[in-house]
């Protein structure tokens, strides 16, 4: 028994080292990265985003992204387990940009909360139309369930932004979990836009309008058609 254990000792140490190495690699993918590593990862993201202007999401591969980015395939698979992980990372980046677009102050004069909804909604539409990658990852027919789930999370944040933007100009009623109403309204717009992508292969004006109408109609179940306006000095 003792002799057998001594013979197995080196093998056990090798297995342990391999396991520790795998753990370190996993941590490196999500936590530690050198300057050149950050640059290569960003290059992969930028290349994937550029490729999605002309390539369907279903046809994207991590190997091809790495080749076009001139990043070693081994490095690409060090950063991302597969193309789905790359797309999820790109989706997170795009969602942050999308949210900043919605957060930008409204410079137009608005007369109703519905007008604020329309202005913000069309900001989002313009963002999607100007970035095919954003469009494919959010409402494209090839978007995976994981990407769709990420888009719902993005809608949660966007719903809070809509609530805040309207609250800048109008006195909204006190409703428990009020931002959730805007999240649900935005989910309705996403459904209309997804149908547009499925039927027409692009975002069409008809479905844009249908989405906006659906969102406002839903919100008007809970929010009065007319809200008290805030005085300019009361703007947040």
Predicted regions and their residues:
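N-terminal intrinsically disordered/low-complexity leader segments
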Residues: 1-39, 223-236
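Generic hydrophobic, amphipathic alpha-helix propensity
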Residues: 37-48, 65, 90-98
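Helix-turn-helix
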Residues: 51, 55-85, 89
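Alpha-helical DNA-contacting segments of helix-turn-helix folds
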Residues: 52, 87-97, 101, 154, ...
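Hydrophobic alpha-helical connector segments
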Residues: 89, 103-129
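Amphipathic alpha-helical packing segments from all-alpha helical-bundle domains
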Residues: 118-119, 146-171, 180-183, 187, ...
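Amphipathic alpha-helical segments used for helix-helix packing
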Residues: 127-148, 163, 191-197
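Hydrophobic/aromatic-rich alpha-helical bundle segments in the mid-to-C-terminal region
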Residues: 168-215, 222-236
């Amino acid at each position: 028994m003792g002799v057998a254990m001594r013979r197995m000792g080196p093998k056990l140490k090798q297995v342990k080292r391999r396991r520790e190495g795998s753990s370190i690699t996993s941590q490196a993918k999500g936590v530690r990265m050198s300057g050149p590593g950050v640059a290569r990862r960003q290059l992969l993201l930028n290349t994937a985003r550029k490729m999605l202007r002309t390539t369907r999401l279903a046809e994207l591969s991590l190997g091809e992204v790495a080749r076009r980015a001139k990043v070693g395939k081994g490095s690409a698979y060090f950063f991302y387990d597969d193309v789905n992980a790359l797309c999820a990372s790109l989706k997170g980046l795009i969602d942050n940009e999308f949210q900043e677009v919605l957060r930008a102050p409204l410079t137009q004069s608005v007369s109703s909360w519905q007008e604020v909804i329309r202005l913000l909604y069309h900001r989002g539409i313009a963002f999607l139309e100007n970035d095919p990658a954003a469009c494919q990852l959010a409402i494209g027919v090839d978007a995976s369930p994981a990407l769709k789930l990420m888009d719902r999370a993005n809608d949660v944040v966007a719903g809070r932004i809509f609530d805040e933007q309207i609250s800048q100009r109008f006195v909204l009623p006190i409703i428990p979990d009020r931002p959730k109403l805007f999240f649900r309204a935005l989910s309705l717009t996403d459904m209309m836009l997804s149908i547009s992508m499925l039927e027409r292969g692009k975002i069409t004006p008809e479905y844009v309008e249908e989405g906006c109408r659906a969102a406002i109609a839903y919100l008007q179940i809970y929010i009065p058609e007319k809200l008290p306006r805030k005085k300019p000095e009361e703007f947040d």
